[in-house]
Amino acid sequence: MIGFSAFILRNYYAAIGWNEDNLYSSLTRTSSALLDFQLPQSLILQLANSPTPIFFTSYALDALPQLNGSISYITTSMPLDEIGSGRATAFKNVIERFRVFPPPKRPQPKDEVWLGGKRIEGRDYLLYSRLHLPSLHLSGLATTRLTPTLQAHLAFLSQPAHPTSTRPTPPQTPPSHTRQPSEPSTPAPSPTPGNVFISLQHDTGRYCGEYTYSVQDGMVGLRTLYNFGWHGDEESEVDKKERREREGKRIDEEEMMEGGLKGRFSAGGEVYFSAKQRSFGISTGLRFTTVPPTLPLPLNAPVPSPPTTLTLLYNPLIGFLSSAYSAQVSPTVALATRFGVNVYSYESDLSVGGEWWIGRRRGKRGLTTDAEPQLDAESRDPVVTGIEENRELTEKMAQRASLRQVTLRDEIGEDVHAEKELYSPIPVMTDVNAGELAQQISPRLQPQQDLDDERDGVLKARLSGNWQFALLYEARIRNCLVSAGVLADLTGRQHPIRSIGLEVQYFS
């Protein structure tokens, strides 16, 4: 379960049109959701409130093994109207899950607002602050978009003069592929009272660069990611097909081979240098992601490949090589595996994990065999009803034409029905533009249908090479989001259970 602050930050990126996945630090995000999911370490309770679309508050309480808490405040320049109660929020958006992200797009500038001959739209920004109790640590994050393709981040951590043994990390610091999570950091001789982390991101869709600087250890870093075969600002596949049909086929043009995985490649790397610790690091990575097929599919089209992501990471300094494969094998099951090896010492590690969406769909809850469900007011929209009728009509006509069983009476009846719809305010549509028109006319209906179709629970499991087994269950129970996890050591006979945790989140 992701935190409320991370949930707000992702919605803010979506509102301003910023590519959330087009970063080198997010190269292994798909496989990490199945193999590196975090378990609740204790009993955690989090309450979040949204008094206005641009201001949010959050309160967290950690009861075990000692009582800790925090208070958070977030404000944004862009109203986030989609964030509401825990029951109205899509469950798939508040958890880390298997996901194939769409191709990145070039960020567009903010809409111009003029008043008295001057532009007054302002600049996009997000401000976040969190106070940790009783240690009185203060952490925060400030992000703003300087240009349509340039964004700046400033994360800070302030602590009292006598720091405790456990110190929180700066919020939303991107992970590094050159350091392993199990490696302990080098203890500083005299801890500083705080730290400031500065990041500058330049995203053009095809290319993304990230420049970072940490004040505490004087570390300067550079991360880059390049997308091959990027078509963010070019014509779509449908437009290309129509243009080819108009122009005709060239003499030297060959037939396209069907089948296989159709996707896009992304390659990147990172370099960092610490002046105080006199350390240097480098890593490179490669990712292949399948591209969803263009709808509607032709009748003779091959079966589309399942959503798949393959990643390869290599650190030449320590000789660490890691490869991961993740795929969605069914609509409710996704699997992933990762193999890492050190080419210098030949030490290796294998991890296997997956997720299984369980529970009944929200739209089917409360239904009985004796009574039909009551239709929602938005589902009785006449425009959407006409869309469904036109879709059924198109499918029926295509089926009859293929079977050559259309009678003269049926043809006359269908012609009369089509003539009536020409004078109807509801236009005749195909499957290509039916979804677009439905979103334009009734934008609130699609989120409601997604909420009714989604499942309210997911079960995750992973098994690592050292025979540690982790199990996590995340679900929506009424208006609360619940996460329960257990970590077990299959080789330990005296104490096989390492940790058990429970986390409850409530959005209002």
Swiss-Prot record:
It is found in: Mitochondrion outer membrane. The keyword Acetylation does not apply. One of its GO terms (biological process) is establishment of mitochondrion localization. Keywords: Membrane, Mitochondrion, Mitochondrion outer membrane, Transmembrane, Transmembrane beta strand. It holds the Pfam family MDM10. InterPro entries: Mdm10. It comes from the Eukaryota. HAMAP family: Mdm10. Component of the ER-mitochondria encounter structure (ERMES) or MDM complex, composed of MMM1, MDM10, MDM12 and MDM34. Associates with the mitochondrial outer membrane sorting assembly machinery SAM(core) complex. Belongs to the MDM10 family. Component of the ERMES/MDM complex, which serves as a molecular tether to connect the endoplasmic reticulum and mitochondria. Components of this complex are involved in the control of mitochondrial shape and protein biogenesis and may function in phospholipid exchange. MDM10 is involved in the late assembly steps of the general translocase of the mitochondrial outer membrane (TOM complex). Functions in the TOM40-specific route of the assembly of outer membrane beta-barrel proteins, including the association of TOM40 with the receptor TOM22 and small TOM proteins. This is Mitochondrial distribution and morphology protein 10. The lineage of its organism: Eukaryota, Fungi, Dikarya, Basidiomycota, Agaricomycotina.
